[in-house]
Amino acid sequence: SSRGLGDVYKRQPFAIALTIFSFFQVGFNIEDFKRNWENRKLVTDTLFNPKWEWAIENASQALLETIQIAILASILGCFIALPLSFYASRATNQTTVTYLIYKSFLNFIRTIPDLFWAMLFTVAVGLGPFAGVLALVMFSMAIMGKLLSETIDSIDLGPLEAAKASGARHNQAVFTSALPQILPNFTAYFLYIFELCIRASVILGLVGAGGVGRIIETQRIFLRFDRISPIIVLILVAVIAIEQFSVWLRRKIL
C-alpha cells in the first residue's frame, strides 16, 4: 500500500545513517580496502592451483577424524540431553525449583560459543580430538536440550495423565506415554545436530581441537592456499554426502 511505502521511505534516512555509523564503528577505511585488495593476487594465484595429491595424502585421515569427532559428540550430547529435556519442560516437571535449575543450566550452556568450549577443553585436556569431542558434546547437548524441551512442552498430556491415573509413578508415566511421542522429533533433531557438528568440528580444529581444521590453520599460516582449496573441496563433498545420507535416513525412519 501507499501508506506502507511511505513508512519505508521515512525510515530510509535512519537506515542509511545507521549503516554509515556501523562502517565507522568497525573501522572500515576505503583506502585500506584498496591497498589490501592488491594482495588478492597472492591468494587467487595459489587458491586456484590446487595440490590434490598433497591434500588427499595429508588431509584424508584428518577429515575422517573430523567425521568421527562429530559422530561421537552428537551421540553423547544428544543422549545426555534427552533426560535433561524432560526436567527442563513444564509438561513433565511440575517442580518449579528443579525446572528452573535444568532450564537455566541448558540456557547457560547454549550461551557459550562452541569455540570457547574448544579453547577451554584444549587447556583442560590438551590439544587434540578429545578436546573437540568434549566441546561438541556441550554444543550438541545445548541445541538438543532447547529443541527437545520445547517439543515436550507441546505433547499431548492425555496419555501421561491416564498413565498416572492407572497408578504409574511419574517417571514411569513419562517413559511410557511422553517418550514415545517425542522420539520421531528426537531422531530428526539428532540428524540435524550431526550435520551441524560436522561443520563445527572443522572450525574447532583451528584452535587445536583436532580434525581437518588443524591442517587448514597450519597451511593458512604459511599462505599455502593451493593446499587449502582442495581440502575445502573434500570437506564440501563429505558434507553433501552426509546431508544426502541424512535426508535418506530421515525418510526411512520417519
Sequence positions of predicted segments:
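Short, small-residue-biased leader/transition segments that mark boundaries at the very start
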Residues: 3-9
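Membrane-embedded alpha-helices of multi-pass transport/permease systems
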Residues: 27, 79-86, 116, 131, ...
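Periplasmic/extracellular loop-to-transmembrane helix junction in inner-membrane transport proteins
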Residues: 28-73
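Cytoplasmic-entry segments and transmembrane alpha-helices of multi-pass inner-membrane transporters
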Residues: 84-118, 147-150
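Generic hydrophobic transmembrane alpha-helix motif, especially the helices
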Residues: 106-140
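Glycine-rich helix-loop "coupling/hinge" segments at transmembrane-helix boundaries
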Residues: 123, 199-235, 254
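Short helix-to-coil transition segments within interhelical loops
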Residues: 155-182, 209
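Transmembrane alpha-helices
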Residues: 170-204, 226-235, 242
